Amino acid sequence: INSDFSNETVFNHSHSTKPLFYKISGTWGNHEGSLLLWLLVLTLFIFIFLLRTKKQPKNYRILTSLFQQIIIVGFFIFLLSSSNPFNFIYPTPKEGLGLNPILQDPALAIHPPILYLGYVGSSIIFSSSLSATVLKGINKEWATHIKSWVFASWIFLTLGILLGSIWAYYELGWGGFWFWDPVENVSLMPWLALTTLLHCILVLEKRSNLTSWVVI
Protein backbone atom coordinates (compact mmCIF):
# COMPACT_ATOMS: atom_id res chain seq x y z
CA ILE A 1 0.00 0.00 0.00
CA ASN A 2 1.47 3.34 -1.08
CA SER A 3 1.29 6.37 1.19
CA ASP A 4 0.00 8.98 -1.25
CA PHE A 5 0.24 12.16 0.82
CA SER A 6 -1.17 14.24 -2.02
CA ASN A 7 -4.53 12.97 -0.76
CA GLU A 8 -5.71 15.13 2.13
CA THR A 9 -7.28 12.22 4.03
CA VAL A 10 -4.12 10.12 3.75
CA PHE A 11 -1.97 13.08 4.83
CA ASN A 12 -4.10 13.77 7.91
CA HIS A 13 -4.46 10.18 9.08
CA SER A 14 -1.45 8.19 7.88
CA HIS A 15 2.33 8.04 8.11
CA SER A 16 4.92 6.17 6.05
CA THR A 17 6.23 4.28 9.11
CA LYS A 18 2.80 3.25 10.37
CA PRO A 19 2.08 -0.53 10.38
CA LEU A 20 0.09 -1.81 7.41
CA PHE A 21 -2.84 -2.78 9.64
CA TYR A 22 -3.26 0.80 10.85
CA LYS A 23 -2.72 2.23 7.37
CA ILE A 24 -5.77 0.25 6.28
CA SER A 25 -7.84 1.00 9.38
CA GLY A 26 -6.84 4.66 9.15
CA THR A 27 -8.99 4.81 6.02
CA TRP A 28 -12.11 4.82 8.18
CA GLY A 29 -10.54 6.54 11.19
CA ASN A 30 -12.02 9.86 10.05
CA HIS A 31 -15.34 11.31 8.94
CA GLU A 32 -14.65 11.23 5.19
CA GLY A 33 -13.20 7.73 5.18
CA SER A 34 -15.98 6.33 7.35
CA LEU A 35 -18.58 7.56 4.86
CA LEU A 36 -16.61 5.95 2.05
CA LEU A 37 -16.63 2.68 4.03
CA TRP A 38 -20.38 3.11 4.55
CA LEU A 39 -20.91 3.36 0.78
CA LEU A 40 -18.68 0.34 0.17
CA VAL A 41 -20.70 -1.79 2.58
CA LEU A 42 -23.98 -0.53 1.07
CA THR A 43 -22.80 -1.60 -2.38
CA LEU A 44 -21.50 -4.95 -1.13
CA PHE A 45 -24.77 -5.75 0.63
CA ILE A 46 -26.99 -5.03 -2.37
CA PHE A 47 -24.72 -7.33 -4.41
CA ILE A 48 -25.08 -10.11 -1.81
CA PHE A 49 -28.84 -9.52 -1.64
CA LEU A 50 -29.21 -9.98 -5.40
CA LEU A 51 -27.13 -13.17 -5.31
CA ARG A 52 -29.20 -14.63 -2.48
CA THR A 53 -32.63 -13.77 -3.89
CA LYS A 54 -32.49 -15.35 -7.35
CA LYS A 55 -35.54 -17.47 -6.49
CA GLN A 56 -37.54 -14.48 -5.24
CA PRO A 57 -40.09 -12.72 -7.51
CA LYS A 58 -38.48 -10.42 -10.06
CA ASN A 59 -40.61 -7.40 -9.11
CA TYR A 60 -39.57 -7.75 -5.48
CA ARG A 61 -35.85 -7.91 -6.35
CA ILE A 62 -36.05 -4.92 -8.70
CA LEU A 63 -38.03 -2.78 -6.26
CA THR A 64 -35.74 -3.60 -3.33
CA SER A 65 -32.70 -2.77 -5.47
CA LEU A 66 -34.32 0.52 -6.50
CA PHE A 67 -34.94 1.60 -2.90
CA GLN A 68 -31.41 0.58 -1.98
CA GLN A 69 -29.93 2.51 -4.89
CA ILE A 70 -31.80 5.63 -3.77
CA ILE A 71 -30.09 5.32 -0.39
CA ILE A 72 -26.70 4.79 -2.05
CA VAL A 73 -27.12 7.82 -4.35
CA GLY A 74 -28.14 9.98 -1.38
CA PHE A 75 -25.03 9.07 0.59
CA PHE A 76 -22.86 9.45 -2.52
CA ILE A 77 -24.10 13.00 -3.12
CA PHE A 78 -23.53 13.85 0.55
CA LEU A 79 -20.03 12.36 0.40
CA LEU A 80 -18.93 14.35 -2.63
CA SER A 81 -20.61 17.60 -1.61
CA SER A 82 -19.52 17.87 2.03
CA SER A 83 -17.12 15.05 2.98
CA ASN A 84 -15.03 14.31 -0.09
CA PRO A 85 -12.24 11.83 0.80
CA PHE A 86 -10.47 12.52 -2.51
CA ASN A 87 -9.37 16.12 -1.95
CA PHE A 88 -5.80 16.77 -3.03
CA ILE A 89 -2.99 18.82 -1.49
CA TYR A 90 -0.47 20.71 -3.60
CA PRO A 91 2.45 20.73 -3.26
CA THR A 92 2.54 17.13 -2.04
CA PRO A 93 3.83 16.81 1.56
CA LYS A 94 6.76 14.47 2.12
CA GLU A 95 5.21 12.94 5.22
CA GLY A 96 1.78 12.52 6.80
CA LEU A 97 0.56 13.60 10.22
CA GLY A 98 -0.28 10.05 11.29
CA LEU A 99 -3.32 8.52 12.94
CA ASN A 100 -4.42 9.66 16.38
CA PRO A 101 -2.62 7.33 18.87
CA ILE A 102 -5.90 6.65 20.69
CA LEU A 103 -7.32 5.19 17.48
CA GLN A 104 -4.35 2.86 16.95
CA ASP A 105 -5.94 -0.09 18.69
CA PRO A 106 -6.92 -3.50 17.25
CA ALA A 107 -10.39 -3.42 18.82
CA LEU A 108 -11.16 0.03 17.46
CA ALA A 109 -9.65 -0.77 14.06
CA ILE A 110 -12.22 -3.51 13.40
CA HIS A 111 -15.01 -1.81 15.38
CA PRO A 112 -16.29 0.52 12.59
CA PRO A 113 -16.50 -2.13 9.81
CA ILE A 114 -18.36 -4.56 12.07
CA LEU A 115 -20.67 -1.83 13.34
CA TYR A 116 -21.36 -0.68 9.78
CA LEU A 117 -22.25 -4.23 8.73
CA GLY A 118 -25.00 -4.03 11.33
CA TYR A 119 -26.12 -0.54 10.35
CA VAL A 120 -26.10 -1.14 6.61
CA GLY A 121 -27.69 -4.56 6.95
CA SER A 122 -30.64 -2.69 8.41
CA SER A 123 -30.94 -0.70 5.18
CA ILE A 124 -31.52 -3.93 3.25
CA ILE A 125 -34.27 -4.83 5.72
CA PHE A 126 -35.77 -1.36 5.25
CA SER A 127 -35.71 -1.56 1.43
CA SER A 128 -37.06 -5.10 1.50
CA SER A 129 -39.94 -4.19 3.80
CA LEU A 130 -40.86 -1.22 1.59
CA SER A 131 -40.90 -3.49 -1.47
CA ALA A 132 -42.94 -6.15 0.29
CA THR A 133 -45.40 -3.49 1.49
CA VAL A 134 -45.84 -2.07 -2.02
CA LEU A 135 -46.30 -5.58 -3.46
CA LYS A 136 -48.52 -6.64 -0.53
CA GLY A 137 -46.11 -9.41 0.36
CA ILE A 138 -45.65 -9.02 4.13
CA ASN A 139 -46.36 -12.65 5.07
CA LYS A 140 -44.81 -15.80 6.52
CA GLU A 141 -42.74 -16.48 3.41
CA TRP A 142 -41.26 -12.99 3.42
CA ALA A 143 -40.51 -13.29 7.15
CA THR A 144 -38.60 -16.53 6.53
CA HIS A 145 -36.65 -14.87 3.73
CA ILE A 146 -35.72 -11.66 5.59
CA LYS A 147 -35.09 -13.32 8.96
CA SER A 148 -31.47 -14.13 8.11
CA TRP A 149 -30.77 -10.46 7.30
CA VAL A 150 -32.31 -9.32 10.57
CA PHE A 151 -30.34 -11.88 12.56
CA ALA A 152 -27.05 -11.11 10.78
CA SER A 153 -27.48 -7.35 11.26
CA TRP A 154 -28.29 -7.89 14.94
CA ILE A 155 -25.17 -10.03 15.45
CA PHE A 156 -22.86 -7.53 13.72
CA LEU A 157 -24.34 -4.60 15.63
CA THR A 158 -23.98 -6.49 18.92
CA LEU A 159 -20.33 -7.32 18.20
CA GLY A 160 -19.64 -3.73 17.14
CA ILE A 161 -21.11 -2.33 20.36
CA LEU A 162 -19.16 -4.84 22.47
CA LEU A 163 -15.86 -3.99 20.74
CA GLY A 164 -16.48 -0.27 21.16
CA SER A 165 -17.30 -0.73 24.85
CA ILE A 166 -14.17 -2.80 25.49
CA TRP A 167 -12.00 -0.20 23.76
CA ALA A 168 -13.62 2.66 25.70
CA TYR A 169 -13.05 0.82 28.99
CA TYR A 170 -9.27 0.38 28.76
CA GLU A 171 -8.41 3.29 26.44
CA LEU A 172 -10.56 6.21 27.55
CA GLY A 173 -10.57 5.38 31.26
CA TRP A 174 -14.27 6.00 31.79
CA GLY A 175 -14.27 3.41 34.57
CA GLY A 176 -16.89 1.27 32.86
CA PHE A 177 -17.90 -0.40 29.61
CA TRP A 178 -20.77 1.98 28.95
CA PHE A 179 -21.27 5.70 29.21
CA TRP A 180 -24.55 7.39 28.32
CA ASP A 181 -23.24 9.73 25.66
CA PRO A 182 -24.59 10.25 22.11
CA VAL A 183 -21.76 8.26 20.48
CA GLU A 184 -22.78 5.08 22.27
CA ASN A 185 -26.51 5.74 22.35
CA VAL A 186 -26.62 6.16 18.58
CA SER A 187 -25.70 2.48 18.19
CA LEU A 188 -27.95 1.34 21.05
CA MET A 189 -31.16 2.66 19.45
CA PRO A 190 -30.82 0.60 16.23
CA TRP A 191 -29.83 -2.43 18.34
CA LEU A 192 -33.03 -2.14 20.39
CA ALA A 193 -35.06 -1.72 17.20
CA LEU A 194 -33.43 -4.78 15.61
CA THR A 195 -34.00 -6.82 18.77
CA THR A 196 -37.69 -5.93 18.68
CA LEU A 197 -37.88 -6.63 14.94
CA LEU A 198 -36.22 -10.01 15.36
CA HIS A 199 -38.89 -11.08 17.85
CA CYS A 200 -41.68 -9.74 15.63
CA ILE A 201 -40.28 -11.51 12.56
CA LEU A 202 -40.24 -14.83 14.43
CA VAL A 203 -43.86 -14.33 15.49
CA LEU A 204 -44.86 -13.41 11.92
CA GLU A 205 -43.09 -16.49 10.56
CA LYS A 206 -44.68 -18.92 13.02
CA ARG A 207 -48.13 -17.40 13.69
CA SER A 208 -48.71 -14.84 10.90
CA ASN A 209 -49.20 -12.14 13.53
CA LEU A 210 -47.65 -8.70 14.23
CA THR A 211 -47.57 -7.75 10.54
CA SER A 212 -48.04 -4.06 11.29
CA TRP A 213 -45.35 -4.08 13.96
CA VAL A 214 -42.87 -5.65 11.56
CA VAL A 215 -43.47 -2.88 9.01
CA ILE A 216 -43.17 -0.16 11.66
Model-derived features with residue positions:
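Polytopic transmembrane helical bundles with strong interfacial aromatic enrichment
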Residues: I1-I216
